[in-house]
């Protein structure tokens, strides 16, 4: 199979990673934070975060999760699309010693309830766009901690606009009488 994505890799980024080099994903992350501190780690909506920023934000979020009394190995659900918050949350959960439970943000309440019960998730990090689904099933799950973020939280000034648009879009509905 041709690996066409390789032509988009920046100079110096290896095409392959020796998976035996690291004992865990956390070890890989920690090395990357040091080695590539000033390089872009992720880009979303033209906003980039560096490995240093990813290190700082995930460390802070991981410490917050630990402060909630979750035990090592606890399951933390992540209910968000591909936005900058996702890699931050993933790194935070792993660095804090917890397990990531990926949750489709488009799940129905029934599907979400099943996933949360089946996984035994004790916490969930969710974007506000999907928080109403979480709210509907929360009493029927083991989830004790809910962390809610907004779509534009990591986008700077653009994020303020994105959050306003997302919130306005949620509050307005198409009026069929105008047809």
How should these model regions be labeled?
Residues 15-17, 48-49, 76-77, 99, ...:
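Short, contiguous strand/loop micro-motifs
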Residues 1-2, 33-38, 176-179:
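A short, compositionally biased
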Residues 1-22:
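Flexible, non-catalytic linker and terminal segments flanking ANL/adenylate-forming cores
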Residues 67-68, 95-176:
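Structural core segment of the AMP-binding/adenylate-forming
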């Amino acid at each position: 199979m041709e690996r066409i994505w390789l032509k988009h890799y920046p100079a110096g980024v290896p095409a392959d990673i020796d998976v035996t080099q690291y004992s865990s994903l956390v070890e890989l992350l920690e090395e990357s934070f040091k080695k590539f501190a000033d390089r872009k780690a992720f880009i979303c909506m033209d906003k980039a975060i560096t490995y240093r920023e990813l290190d700082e934000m995930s460390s802070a979020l991981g410490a917050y999760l630990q402060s909630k009394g979750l035990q090592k190995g606890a399951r933390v659900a992540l209910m968000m699309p591909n936005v900058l918050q996702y890699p931050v949350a993933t790194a935070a959960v792993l660095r804090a010693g917890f397990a990531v439970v990926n949750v489709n943000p488009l799940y129905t309440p029934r599907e979400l309830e099943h996933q949360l019960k089946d996984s035994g998730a004790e916490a969930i990090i969710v974007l506000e766009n999907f928080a109403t689904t979480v709210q509907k099933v929360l009493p029927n799950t083991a989830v004790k901690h809910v962390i809610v973020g907004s779509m534009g939280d990591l986008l700077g000034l653009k994020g303020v606009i994105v959050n306003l648009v997302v919130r306005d879009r949620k509050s307005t509905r198409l009026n069929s009488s105008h047809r």
